[in-house]
Amino acid sequence: MIATKLNPALSAVLAVTALIASQPAAAISITFDYSYDTSGFFAGHADRQSLLNQAASEFTTRLQDQLTAITSRGYKHFDAKFLDPSSGAIVTKNDYDIAANDLVVFVGGQNLGASILGEGGPGGYSASGFSSLALNRGQNTTTDFGPWGGAISFGNSANWYFDQDATTTESFSGYDFYSVAVHELGHVLGFGSAPSFGALVVNNQFTGTASSTLYGGSVPMGDDSHWKQGLTSTANGVTQQVSMAPGISASQRKHFTELDFAGLKDMGWEVSPVTAVPVPAAAWLFFSGLAGLFGFARRRMA
């Protein structure tokens, strides 16, 4: 199963498978930065990088937000902050620029412990000379969320399954790297950590309109702001367990389901509908840690 807990180390330093019939043009892009992959988890492994891009496409084909650029010039300074995906150390990139409609995600691998598959979340920042609206990329922080990107670490000792083509469904052993990447990207987008998400959690129930309408009532939450383990929804017309539950089993594939997308919609992301022709669908824990300094939040999957 996947469990969500507070990460003490973080709080100490920082508080598909379908044929698409019709689909609007993507509005956002996700760029993976391997410059902190000092452990070599991705170096020389084109298959792993390809799977990351395939995981990102689950979001870039559905999210239609218009994110403003962040440009450090003159008196305007934007310093991006995140945890090094290969060491966990705090990284600050001074006068960092982000292109319009792009999210940058730093990725790498490290020893995350005996049961941790991945760790990820949106990055933080310190800045001067920018308005609050500009820092949040033109999004209202009360009802929306506009990160610059974030970071994801993958456990380098996990028994991974690296699919050659995530659009196919076959039996496999090990833990599905693609599914973990999709889950952690959900956290980079603010699932479980964005203020606009937290504002909708009441008595451990998620009360967002889109999610409640789809589920048939308030959605029960699991540990540390995941969906409750065992909830199901559909992805490309196929019923499966939700991606943003706190756990995944070996030999299990999880796409980002309609309930997962509804959660993003409720926290402010503009999610387009999709028409698809479905094909047949064929534990470790997701650990989630929140941190507060500079608005940084990071999630872990184990």
What are these regions, as identified by a protein language model?
Residues 2-12:
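Bacterial N-terminal signal peptides that target proteins for export
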Residues 10, 26, 222, 280-282:
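Intrinsically disordered, low-complexity segments enriched in proline/serine/threonine
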Residues 21-23:
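N-terminal signal peptide c-region/cleavage motif recognized by signal peptidases
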Residues 27-182, 188-275:
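Extracellular zinc-dependent metalloprotease catalytic-domain scaffold
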Residues 278-297:
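A short, hydrophobic C-terminal helix/tail in secreted or cell-surface proteins
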Residues 299-302:
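Short, charged juxtamembrane terminal tails flanking transmembrane helices
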